[in-house]
Amino acid sequence: TPWKMMGRMHDKYLIADGSIYILGGRNTYNYFLGDFEKYKNYDRDVLVICENPQKENSVSQLLDYFENIWKQDDCAYFHEDKKLADKASVKKAALRMEEEYKEYAAEYKECIFDSDYTDETFETEKITLVSNPIHTGAKEPVVWYTLGELMKNAKERVKIHTPYIICNEMMYNTWADVAKNVSEFSVMTNSAANNGNPFGSADYALNRDKIVDTGIDIWEYEGGFSYHGKSILIDDNLSVIGSFNMDMRSAYLDTELMLVIRSSEINKQLEEGLMTYEKMS
């Protein structure tokens, strides 16, 4: 229907064994996943391990979120015909995937191994999942409201990374309020020339002065390949990572997920990651 046709499921996450998950802004498409020479995107995800998944925590939040998406009327099986597996084209595709995996495993042996990821992660004080409504119609901008309040309550700094900036007056006003309260307030986004989204780059070029007028400092990324990370650094103990772009589609139309992580170690690690890109801006 016309009032639903623009709704999109924009979340990106993978849950394993009900106790570990990856969540971020990375699409499952070739140039989001690989290191290709001609075209690729730079992205960011976060790995979360829950040692006690029976308790109320972010993994239980995410599992409940998945179940609610799965059960709603707008979701349906693409097909349930097991006979498709007997088609020659399907068998050929399955064989090709098996062969490509063997080639990958042989070329990248260092990536195929069992690992205790708890040795490579940091213990956090708290992780909270923030989400938009999941229906396909126009949405209350829950994620935007939540992020806005987190940023307004920062004591010293807020650093945003987003591939796109397409705001309305309410969103500009939120940033203006943050700028009044926070001395170090900046955003890094793709320059118009470096942006892989022509609509996003056109709106940014047209409204850049409006963004500057909010009081935020802008860094334009010029790394040659489009930057696709969506993150917010707040003071020295809060990190926000997920799928939400600083645009009206993420605010009002799409399903979106952002993780709010309270941890000084994660904050420091995220800052180091953000700065590698800001050096090219």
Where are these regions (language model features)?
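Charged, low-complexity intrinsically disordered terminal segments
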Residues: 1-12, 16-281
